[in-house]
């Protein structure tokens, strides 16, 4: 203890005088004490003035001490005075220990500031004797901090208690008073010692090894303050001014923590402690708080009438802090609140349970009602379904009747194009498209493309051709790669047409039977009606005969002989003659409902397909005959006249300028390039049956003559393509709508396979998907063999070559390894397409119409590479002007455009004019 006191005295001696005089005034008071520091500049010896508390009966007994540093002393006296001071402190502690309260702590380990003289027993002699020794100590250490505390304790209780309190304060040393509270207050602080030991450590920066749980708050506070002062003095001995501030600040913080945390179970930081102290002062400034604490069983010594004295912050804070039941009150309040919450929760749970039960009951009722409603609805739905089924059956029957009447008046597309239907299981693809169908005339909407509904198949988007992997196979299409289950040129995926033609082949036999039944019934009705007419006529004749006989009997017998023989056969011959034309007229129940197509001799335009299509073995020498020879045996194109000049079969014919092997008759009057009838160029890729998917041109009669509009050889397809299936309609009448196959002869395809045939010429624009050459405004006459089907509008070639250029540009982007390479003589670029994904070229083909005129000179290649150079597309004036130019006969005529005389146009019958299908 002596060594510690010596160290602390030496360390604290390094603090300057002025620092003590300025900063120590700011020390925070303890709960029951006020620190008064006075500095006297005089060099007189230090006088310790203490008022004896025994004789003082006043409300407060302040003890004022003033420590004045002496001016001159010796070091020997300093040491002697220090030891004597320590001895007197220990002796006084031993004296005061039995009389102090049981809670008075042990001797201090490190007294805070032994700089100041001790507060001793009422004998002031010891203090006066120790003053000069203390003066010597202060002389050696030039600075001292003298602190003197006067615990202001208002006394209004009996004098004995006051005497006890004052005696306790006397017995305690002057600086140890910081570590203790009055003995009466220690009783209330014992409960909080454990918490305070931990809470005070937060503000101290030194070792806080205060494990004395029995010590009071002052004890802990002094230890901490001493440690802080020691460390700060050691570390900061050079900075004297800062040391003063550090000491005082540490004292302030620790004192505040001690008082604030005395009753708090939760640790408080020094910043929050000071804030709470201020807030608590404001909360507890009312005098009612002291009265409530007095009535709560606190010791009366602690709750004296301290409001009568001058209140300090420590009084308010300690008074509020040391309510021992505050924590219990808070617990009681919390428990009460928890009970209230529990009650509320229980009530809520009960209410929820009730609500759930009610809801369950309601739900059960609702479910029962819903089940009943569902049962009723199911019954109603079943009834409605039955009604709907009945209605659907009726509607289907009506639709079947309407379809038979409406949709099947024109020739069915499966037999026009002879490509597989969805129900045909992939049929034969080698059958030429031999017939014309009126749905396919326009380039819009009804363009007969593939069935797939991808956006690239829209009619306005031009398609790049899908070049088949086998360019010389017989079953290739100009538009799609051969897939055996695809409808090539049938109607597009329009619901109305699908509904009309999906179940066509299934219904076809039924339709034939119904048609035959209807025809038979009509024949029977006609026969019955004719019989009735005959009976009526016979009765009339008999009556007339009787009358005539009566008259003739009166007249001469010669007149009777002369009049009677002609009269009976004449009425009999009339019904025979009237009935005979009616029977064939009644058989075609379905006729093409187009104003431009009329019956020709009542049998020519019957839509019932002939059992002998143009490639049937019955017509081996004329596969391209538009008219069957059975109907008009006197036609100049009958097989009996195979080598007639009207049927040019010479192989030299394709070399004629009328037959450029590029099928482009640029000035042909039969194809306006942008007319709605304009379709697509044929597939001339060569090999067998390269015309499989081309459209047909019906015959055009001129008077009684039938023109063969095809100039290719007769025997070109009689062997290559198989005979198509027999058409579904009545085999009694052969249709006059026969195709004009637009292909060169296979001989030419073999010889010129290098130049033009090898290039897959597949049109791309939506305008040339299908060429229907039957829409020519003025078909050629029968006498000219060279106005034949092989002229194709030059615009086809423009489109195809522009597509070549576009494909060449696009394939730089579409670096597709699967694209097949072909060389097209009509353009200087490689014609690259991909079977899989070359359709990306479609996007650039929309500009083909603008580029047509730029590529005219490179587009027309005849078989012998004779280029027909045309500068522009034929206009309507050109097309109409060529109608009046004479034509030349012969296979090698020099004219490059088909000529059409006006005589034939003027001499055409009205029925044949209606068959021109002009626009």
Curated annotation (Swiss-Prot):
Residues 16-25, 420-433, 678-695, 754-768, 883-899 have a biased composition (Polar residues). It comes from the Eukaryota. Residues 1-15, 34-75, 96-107, 141-153, 186-292, 450-471, 553-564, 573-589, 618-635, 712-723, 798-863 have a biased composition (Low complexity). Residues 1-167, 179-312, 415-491, 553-739, 751-863, 883-906 are annotated as: Disordered. Residues 154-167, 785-797 have a biased composition (Basic and acidic residues). This is Putative uncharacterized protein DDB_G0291608. It comes from Dictyostelium discoideum (Social amoeba). The lineage of its organism: Eukaryota, Amoebozoa, Evosea, Eumycetozoa, Dictyostelia.
